[in-house]
UniProtKB/Swiss-Prot annotation:
Segment annotated as transit peptide: 1-79
Reaction catalysis annotation: pyruvate + phosphate + ATP = phosphoenolpyruvate + AMP + diphosphate + H(+)
Function: Formation of phosphoenolpyruvate.
Active site: H538, C916
Similarity-based family: Belongs to the PEP-utilizing enzyme family.
Protein name, entry field: Pyruvate, phosphate dikinase, chloroplastic
Secretion signal span: none
GO molecular function annotation: ATP binding; kinase activity; metal ion binding; pyruvate, phosphate dikinase activity
Amino acid sequence: MMSSLFVEGMLLKSADESCLPAKGKQRRTGDLRRLNHHRQPAFVRWICRRKLSGVSRIEFHSGGLTPPRAVLNPVSPPVTTTKKRVFTFGKGRSEGNKDMKSLLGGKGANLAEMASIGLSVPPGLTISTEACEEYQQNGKKLPPGLWDEILEGLRYVQKEMSASLGDPSKPLLLSVRSGAAISMPGMMDTVLNLGLNDEVVAGLAGKSGARFAYDSYRRFLDMFGNVVMGIPHSLFDEKLEEMKAEKGVHLDTDLTAADLKDLVEQYKNVYVEAKGEKFPTDPKKQLELAVNAVFDSWDSPRANKYRSINQITGLKGTAVNIQCMVFGNMGNTSGTGVLFTRNPSTGEKKLYGEFLVNAQGEDVVAGIRTPEDLATMETCMPEAYRELVENCKILERHYKDMMDIEFTVQENRLWMLQCRTGKRTGKGAVRIAVDMVNEGLIDTRTAIKRVETQHLDQLLHPQFENPSAYKSHVVATGLPASPGAAVGQVVFSAEDAETWHAQGKSAILVRTETSPEDVGGMHAAAGILTARGGMTSHAAVVARGWGKCCVSGCADIRVNDDMKVLTIGDRVIKEGDWLSLNGSTGEVILGKQLLAPPAMSNDLETFMSWADQVRRLKVMANADTPNDALTARNNGAQGIGLCRTEHMFFASDERIKAVRKMIMAVTPEQRKAALDLLLPYQRSDFEGIFRAMDGLPVTIRLLDPPLHEFLPEGDLEHIVNELAVDTGMSEDEIYSKIEKLSEVNPMLGFRGCRLGISYPELTEMQVRAIFQAAVSMNNQGVTVIPEIMVPLVGTPQELRHQIGVIRGVAANVFAEMGLTMDYKVGTMIEIPRAALIAEEIAKEAEFFSFGTNDLTQMTFGYSRDDVGKFLQIYLSQGILQHDPFEVLDQKGVGQLIKMATEKGRAANPNLKVGICGEHGGEPSSVAFFDGVGLDYVSCSPFRVPIARLAAAQVVV
């Protein structure tokens, strides 16, 4: 009786359930082929017809170009029976699947899935992320029993391959790769060709040719030395460049077998010179050290920085994938490539990738050589190319997403080495989502989940205002690796890019090629330019994931890091010179070119309409001018949730002088005279905003900041001189007034409703301007929905006082102008006490709007102006997980919001509740606001689409 056992989500099959090789003459392609390192490998046809638990059949037919076909039935949920740390895959069977990413990492889970659906995947084993976690907890040593489990998995691979690690007569070489649950391109380590030593390379040379064998050996020595032993790659690269110069060749592929054999000896000497120890020749020791190195790379500075930048938390560690090697460097019938099943930059439904003849995969991914377009493969390896195209279709249909695929062709045989969901730009993400809905692959709710909020952020980035205007300034053209436009000053190191960014400067990071260590500078830079590397190089993949403009593989440039100069022909560009990049065309442009805001595409409008159909939360905008209001409306805002009246005061010298006269006034009469000068300015601005928001609510906050913010900046003598000119007062009078205005802690002082209560004429002027503008616009056919918001309320009595002033002025204006209209009066909840007594305040207010910026400030006791002195220390030490001014503190500030909402609605069931801090555009905060039942969020105009999508993703 055959048995099947479920273990932690895998289907483990008994030996007699495995597919057996059919006898007889074999025919080409579409078959699952046994990996073989010989020059003339035998093709094997596998036919598996036995019914398995949950799998009806997996068929692989030989002959013609018929692709593998898999017919899968759903498997019932597995029952955990034991803790397993090593999972094997290959030959049409796997101990894992695509849903086990948290345990096997993305790479391991997808290798298992590809093998199980019948694609040609070299057999291997995956060490789980939980094993990595145990390794870290065990003092960075392999936990007890794990090495034996790895060797057991290795025996499976050796049996599948009829080859052995360290056996010169039947050599088995391995790749050792990382793979976390969330893709982190280039951040962790890889070792290829593991298992080579002097004896094994001689055996491999006898079977596969000396040049191939010694090329593989020198690559292994370089990679193992760098990744495992910590020897700088540059030490090996120097030897390679010296050898090429000595032999008078330009390419690695032009070196002979004898040259490479000599290079191997030089590489072995590098170990002794750099580390004082010899290269380890025992293959099993090599494997143990490589596994340790991959586990160690999880905690490397570059990996930690990447996770910090991308806010990746909660992962156990990286998995380790050990796989038998297939070789793309066995001559002109071999090669390696990376592709995306659709264009990751534009979303176009067309294979997008690169291919290198006679090369290994790291040459493409690391950007060491600039590869050819994928189309070259169709010409030189047509059968393998056709199989690859068919595999891409299978994977897209299976995963229902755009896939990123690594593959190798060994002597015209295609092998699939990796697949994962492809990283894409904002433009690409939206088009792929819309196209896949139109193709019937996914539904609109799935599409909403496929586009990340940061993708929309990228789409809102500027482009060049007039590309035709800079054509005469184009000095070089590289590969358009990541779209968009970037303008900045040239820097030549990641550290300088971070430093310049911290100083508020826009930097263009220029490198010969980027490495994972550059990740901090890449994130800080406005754009990235590299001399080497293709569209799938490290720089390109990381930049696209961030929506960062990148031009790669620009062969016309020469980078001198030591001299900090960039040479293009006879032109020299120094550090600090201005450069512009067009990541959509690959153009490198001299000088500082003008940027223009982006426009919504038809695909984006379609996509956002799907998001709007499902979201519950309304999305408003914080807008202070008519132009801001128009931008907000064009971005889909459903009204203005915060219009800050004080920003209007800085629009001209006349306005600010009138404000200063009001501040310096001694008597109410003087103050009223100054306010009368301000009223027409305010009224005009409100008219423009009401016109822009025709038919949508506009929430106007009365004056909030402390008065000292409107005084001139500079030393006291300068301030007094300027105020004397502006107000006509004597210097003594001004000194006296400044002394009275000075405060120890202005943000907790004389501001907000305290100003309106102390100077009612200030509230009266602003309210009169609001209602005069509203009636005037109404008379012109504009539908006006005004809402007046009283700031910094901490007691119901404060709000009651201001409401009395507001309603009195409204009645007077309506009587004067012969028209009445509906309006609302509410308050900001930004003082913790207001949240605690929300039921009392709700009896006075028609709406609450949480000012989360000040509410966070007062709840934590952090001054926003001073928090930078310690915030980075708190974040780096884990005292805080996020900047609370960017990501809402849900346990503290969030609970005040939840409590105030519940109390307020209990006292006033018709109470409208929203939030108008910048947290309104932050996705995790938006999810919280939806969960506690707020009616709307309000954020900056450019973040409105992000908030719309975040509100929809909460629902789906």
